[in-house]
Structures are given as C-alpha cells and as structure tokens.
Amino acid sequence: MTKKLTIKRKVKEPEPQNEAPDSHESSDNEEEEEDLLQAVKDPGEDSTDDEGIDQEYQTDSSEDLEFESDEEGNYLGRKGAEGSSGDDDEESAEDEEEEDDADAKKSSKNNDEEAATTSKSIKKSQEKPTSSNKVVPVVPARDPSKVEYADSDTSDEEDIRNTVGNIPMHWYDEYKHIGYDWDAKKIVKPPKGDQIDDFLRKIEDPNFWRTVKDPLTGQEVLLTDADIALIKRINSGRIPNEEHDEYAPWIEWFTSEVEKMPIKNVPDHKRSFLPSGSEKKTVSRMVHALKMGWMKTTEEVQREKQEKRGPKFYMLWETDTSREQMRRIHDPVSAPKRDLPGHAESYNPPPEYLFDEKEAKEWHKLKDEPHRRKLHFMPQKFKSLREVPAYSRYLRERFLRCLDLYLCPRAKRVKLNIDAEYLIPKLPSPRDLQPFPTVESLVYRGHTDLVRSVSVEPKGEYLVSGSDDKTVKIWEIATGRCIRTIETEDVVRCVAWCPNAKLSIIAVATGSRLLLVNPKVGDKLLVKKTDDLLAEAPVLDVIENERIKTAVQWANAEPADQEKGVRVIITHFKPIRQVTWHGRGDYLATVMPEGANRSALIHQLSKRRSQIPFSKSKGLIQCVLFHPVKPCFFVATQHNIRIYDLVKQELIKKLLTNSKWISGMSIHPKGDNLLVSTYDKKMLWFDLDLSTKPYQTMRLHRNAVRSVAFHLRYPLFASGSDDQAVIVSHGMVYNDLLQNPLIVPLKKLQTHEKREEFGVLDVNWHPVQPWVFSTGADCTIRLFT
C-alpha cells in the first residue's frame, strides 16, 4: 500500500554576517541531507513547460522530509531527524517553522531590499514501495509578489510557447492539442476539471482569485502583484505606469513669448518721405470728374438707387402658392409628352390589329366604363389616305390634353428598381401539397337542363342533384348510376342533404315549396327511423305569430308525393332560392330574396315550427349560413355580410366586401375563416379574428364566380365560375393565431361546356375523400379526383 509523503521547502533569507548559524544544523546531519538531495534538481531550473503548477515527488520513504534553501535553490540545512516518529516529527517541524517565520520577519525589517520568505507544501504520492530513495522534483509555483522575469533576461517573444500565431483558438476545440511549440511538437491540452474541482480549488487554493487561463497554451497563469496593481489602476481610470508623474513641473523647451525680428534692416529711402506722384495724378482726375459732373458722391448714388427701387410692400402671411411659384421658377417640371401613334392608329393597319366580332362586341359592351377598354378607339382600315375622314374626337382629345396640362399636378418621382421576383411571395410547390383532385373521373348525365345544385350524403356513398328540368336525381357515386328520380312541380333551385348521419333527409327548394324527402337509400333501419320521425307532427302549446303563419305553412305530403319519398312540405309565400342545414341536422334556413323583412326563415324539424329572425330588412339577402361551432348566423346581402348571435339576438360583426354583388359563401370547418364568391370575378378570404376587411382577394377567374366550398377534412377549397373552370386551391389554417393562413392555387379543371353565358353553377366536396363535384350549364355533373 503506497503512502503520500510531503517534502516542504522553505526559502530562507540570508542572515547577517555577525549572526552565528543555527545550532540544529550539525555536521552529523550533512551527509544524510546531501544523500537525500542527490536526485533533486536545482529549483531554479525549469524542468517543465508549465509555470506555477505544483507537481508531486515520488519517494519510498515513510517520513516527511523538510529542508531549507536560499533564493537560488542552494541547500542550507535540514529540519528534523529521520528516525523520529510521526508525531514527534510533526511537532518539531511546526516548532522549526515558527522559528523560521520569526527569523524571516526579523530579517525583512532589517533589510527591505531582500525577498520575502514563502513556504510551499508539495504533496508526493508513492505507487509501489521500492528500496531506493530517489526523488523527482517539479518546479514549484512562482511567487506572485515577484515579477516573472525579474531575475532573468528572457524576452516576451521567447516565452511564447505556442507558435500558431494570431488566430482564433476555437479552431482547436475539436482536437486534443492546442498548437505547436518551437520544436514543432504538439502542445497537448491540459485536463479539464469539472465544476466540483473548480469549487474545491476555489475553497482550498488561496490564489484562485488571481489565476487566469492562457488561451494559447490552456495553462493557468498566476498573476503577480504588479499585474494586479496594473489592473486596478486601469479599472480606476488612472495612468498604468506608477512612475509617471502627472503633475511634474512644466519645462519650457521653447519660449511662449513672440519675438518679432526684422528680415532686413535697410534704412528708409529718401523718396519715402516725399508725397506720391501717382496718387497726386489720381486725385486730380477725380477732382476734374466731380467738377464736370461725371463722378457722383456716395450719397448721390444711394439716393438714385432709392428712387429707382420705389416703395416696398411685404406680405404679412406668406401662402403656399408663392412657394409653389418659386419652385416652378427654379425647379420646373416639364409636361409629359403624348405617346407616339402605334400601328393600330394607322389608316391602313395590319389585319392582326383590327377587331374581330368578339372584340368589337366587348368594346361596345364597355361603353359605360371607357377606362376599362384596351384602346380608346376602334381601329379602321382605308384603301388610301384620301378616304380617311375627319377625326370626330379630335377636339375632345385636345380639350382633355389642355385640362391635363392645366389642372394635373406635376411632381418628380424617384423610380424604385425593385426586382419583380422579390414582390412575389414564395409559395410551396403543389407537389408538396397533395392530395388534391387533378383529373376528371366520372360524368353523371341524365338531366336535360341546367343543373343548379348538388349535395353529397354524409357517408359519401350517394349524391343528389337538382335541375331546371324540374327533377331531383339521386346518384350512386362509385358507379355513376341514377338510382331514383323525383319529379317536382317547379324548377329546383337548391338541394341539401342533412349533415346528421343518423337521419336520411334531403331538403329540396323548388319554387315556393320546401320538400323534405326520404331518398330510401342506404341502411333500411335508418330509412325507417326517418319515416317514423317525419310521420307524426308534434303537438305545440305555443301559439304562432300571424307574421309566421302568413309566411310559412307546414303540411304532410299527399299520398302521391309520399310514393316519391316526399314526407313534409313547407310552403313559403315567395320563391325559395337557397336552403342550408345546421350542423346537428335539426335546424335549416331558407332564403327568399323577394320576401323583404321576411327573406330569411329558420325552421326546426323536431318541433315543426318556424322563426323569423329579423324584423327589418337591411338589404337584399342573397344567402345565409350557420356557424359550425358557435350559435352564430351569417347573412349575406348584395354588398356586405352580417354576423348575428342567435342566443343574444344581436349583431356581432359586419364584414365589408367592397364588391358589387355577392353570389355565395362557405365557412371553414373550424369557424374562423370565411370564403365569399362574387359576380365581379373575385373570391374574398375573411379572417374573422383579424379584421372586418378581406385578408386576401383572389382574382383567379375570368368571369363571375358562382360558388365556393371548403373541404371538411383536407385543407382544400374550390371555386366554380362562368368561365367553365373549377379551380382547386390549398387553404391551410394554423392553430397558431399569430400565423396567417397559407393560400396556394393548385389546379385549374376546365372540362364543362358553356351554354348561354353560363358555366359552372355549383361545387361541392366529398365528405371523406379529396374529390370535388361540379354542376354546369351543360346538364352534367362531373367528378374530379
């Protein structure tokens, strides 16, 4: 078992010559001390590259050896006997240390120039017990009170052990070494301790506060007292050099008094004391000019200037017009020149510049909006210049040109050179946003007139459509087969399948009647349950209002209609344009644009009663919509959209569309975003939590947009227009309210045919799959997958 022994070395100051040497340094112990120090190197020699780092001595002795040496490391004497016991050795060592300390203090008082004594304890570890007493020394830590190179002539450049130069040292973070020494050998990084080691060093090491890390070698350097004093002086804002005297007496190396001395000391000439002849001639000329009246005095010149100038009048309140006049004088802006005539204005233009019938018809159609025309005139062709008549709009164009020159303000604008690609928002690729419909898969044919509306069963197996041929057809989606056809007495404007999967009901708006139809498809138990629900009318204790009785009447279907599947008929006093269901399937709303203040009605299926939510009409109602989550009701007029709270019966918000005519709207399944279609070729995306104005206006179609629809599961929405196109777009709504919705147009599906200026009339999504259905004026229903 190894034992760590400690060798203590004390630096003892030289004693005065008149004092005798210590009594305990006898000649008997000199031989033993010399044998002990045979393997010990001179402490003045630097055996390692690390300054100030304590190292251990390996010895096989079982004793603590203590000896004394001078500043240069010469051996002076040994303290204590080798054969004494551990306790006696410790006591004798302590007594000798006290005596040495007293001697050191005494000598420091007598001689201030001598170095102070310091004691260092160096621990030694023994790995295996051996018979030899060989001791390997390590250079002790440097005394902080002394300058590092006070006793040597070593320069700073020679002390630089790391030769990598002035580079960032973090380049060596991934390597085990930190650079190269003068012999081109790697300098290995010192071992790094953890936080516990740092904490123990902070407690045990008294010099921890003055220890810094050298970034070049990674070693820890102990700051001297001079270094600390220098740092303190710099922090306190004083001059770093203590020997510099700030208030030394001023030495005038050069005098501050100006001494004037002549360049040449030549005596004045004799003619310098006589009057100048040239000045005499000049004065005589001026006198002659005054006598002849050619020359005037200063007073006469000032008087003539005052008479010419006349009286001055100043404006008390200066206006902006005067400043503008001065600006026009000093910085005029020339009038813009008219554009040179092009090929279209020629009397014999090329054929491609002449209008065809379609372009001429469109040009005449924009008579009320001439600013939207491509050209302000219609190009004409003549055989010769003699046949060209007088230009009928010449005087008007000259008059408008004069108005532009006279009334239009002129200003210089700095043209910004902005790259067009910088203005285009960066959108993800459509390939990354799949799935979405890309091709036409099925065409459902069977109607003989316009197909106005389409709706899908909640489970996604069947499809219902309504047409102007006064029929309602139920289709099987997978095969395209028409299962049932229900004939009505009037044009079918709208159909809507009940969103509640526990009921099998279709609401059909035909003329002024609302038919509740059981399609008799799907689960037989579900069909029977629906018939039982609609068979008997519930008994109502509440007396209905006269306004409601005159507006709507509930009745069971006749036997002939019962065979077709019609169960309940709700008769309105005006033609119905739209019908929509609440998410739970118990309420449905109808819109009658000609109904004035009774245009919108809400019907409750379970109690067979109706309500008129509004007492006053604030516009021509186009369509209505239920909120999917909250008890809110959306009412769209021609120009605006109002949101009402059905519980509090008050207006919540009014959305400003800035459009001429609203055609339809659809709400996002989460209920925070609304999509509106208009007849003026626009789609408006409203963020209900953000503002009452559109978050984004999309102009994707060339003609009126008839219908829009959100998908219930996927971040998709579609729009149908009279340009026979169905445009599918990606509309991602994030849960983070601080992140705006992502809108990306994906695919344009254009397979419908145009009939009498009509194209796609309605679009609807499959409830489960990313499929979209569209109805058109070509009497077909098309499925895109």
Curated annotation (Swiss-Prot):
SMART domains according to UniProt: BOP1NT, WD40
GO cellular component, one term: PeBoW complex
Basic residues composition bias: residue spans: 1-11
Any one GO BP annotation for this protein: regulation of hemocyte proliferation
Homology family: Belongs to the WD repeat BOP1/ERB1 family.
Function: Required for maturation of ribosomal RNAs and formation of the large ribosomal subunit.
Name the UniProt record assigns to this protein: Ribosome biogenesis protein BOP1 homolog
